[in-house]
Structure formats: structure tokens, C-alpha cells
């Protein structure tokens, strides 16, 4: 469960290393975000000489959470970290590579470009 002020790792090569959630896109008073939700975040740590810089406000989709994800068939997914992929206004990733495993629930939410770039889909 991701809420405001939560720090997340960035799972792509867009230039950001860590981001902090400042808003959850959706309802006006939504408290928590889960896998597949879009958040507004600020970059807290970035790689030097890249397009994204520290303190820049971006949109990101959550791809991994430490809170377990329960599927209809009884399988429970839990990851070691909270991670997100930075996206643009159309929902396409800003980076060209995705690091780490991605859940298949993102395909149902029309993040097909992220799923196709991922090395492993669980």
C-alpha cells in the first residue's frame, strides 16, 4: 500500500533512482495506491547528466509493492521493495528498459508497453 510521502525505487532507466509519492490519481480523497495505480511523485535521487533531475514532478505507475497482492486463483504475490515506472501523459514509459519482475495485472490495465519491456512477468 502506497500513500503520500512513501519513497519508491524506480524500476526503469529514465534517470531517476528514487521518487516520493505526493498524490494518488483517482478519487479526491483516495488514501492508498496498489499495483497498477498511477501516482504523482517528486524525484528524490537522480543519476547525473540524464533528462530527469532531482525535485522534478512526474507521473508513475506502481509495479511492485511489499504489501501482498491476492489473485482470484489463491496465489499471493509479495515483492521485496516498492517500485514504480515513470510514465508520460499517454501512459508510455519514459525509459527504454524495465528492471525486475512485473505482475501480469498491468496487462489488464493497458500498460502493454511496460509489460513488453519487462524481463519477467509473474
Swiss-Prot record:
GO biological process, one term: translation
Matches recorded under Gene3D superfamilies: Ribosomal protein L14 (2.40.150.20)
CDD domains: Ribosomal_uL14
SMART domains: Ribosomal_L14
The keyword Ribosomal protein is annotated on this UniProt entry: yes
Matches recorded under NCBIfam families: rplN_bact
SUBUNIT field: Part of the 50S ribosomal subunit.
Record's function text: Binds to 23S rRNA.
Name of this chain's protein: Large ribosomal subunit protein uL14c
Organism encoding this protein: Cuscuta obtusiflora
Gene encoding the protein: rpl14
